[in-house]
Amino acid sequence: MSEQGDLNQAIAEEGGTEQETATPENGIVKSESLDEEEKLELQRRLEAQNQERRKSKSGAGKGKLTRSLAVCEESSARPGGESLQDQTL
């Protein structure tokens, strides 16, 4: 009986070590999934930043376009602009 008790105890200990080894494996899986989640979150943040940059660049482009039109309007709004050059000659 003592041998069976020793065997049962050994089996129970082995089962315990299997559970202990299973826990770190689960921890590794969790840490890998956390790493993947962190990577996904970083990618989302980068994409959001890139979209904001694109919007700001497109907005800046519109501002430049508006300014260039304003310059054209000013130069075309001066009907006497050519006469000023003729007067200096």
Curated annotation (Swiss-Prot):
UniProtKB keywords: Acetylation, Calmodulin-binding, Cytoplasm, Phosphoprotein
UniProt GO cellular component terms: cytoplasm
PTM characteristics: Phosphorylation at Ser-56 favors interaction with CALM1.
Name the record gives this protein: cAMP-regulated phosphoprotein 21
Chain positions with N-acetylserine modification: 2
UniProt keyword Phosphoprotein, yes or no: yes
Biased composition, class Basic and acidic residues, residue ranges: 40-53
Subunit structure and binding partners: Interacts with CALM1.
Function summary: May act as a competitive inhibitor of calmodulin-dependent enzymes such as calcineurin in neurons.
Region (Disordered) residue spans: 1-89
UniProt biased composition (Low complexity): 9-25
Keyword Coiled coil carried by entry: no
Residues with the Phosphoserine modification: 33, 56
GO MF assignments: calmodulin binding
Compartment(s): Cytoplasm
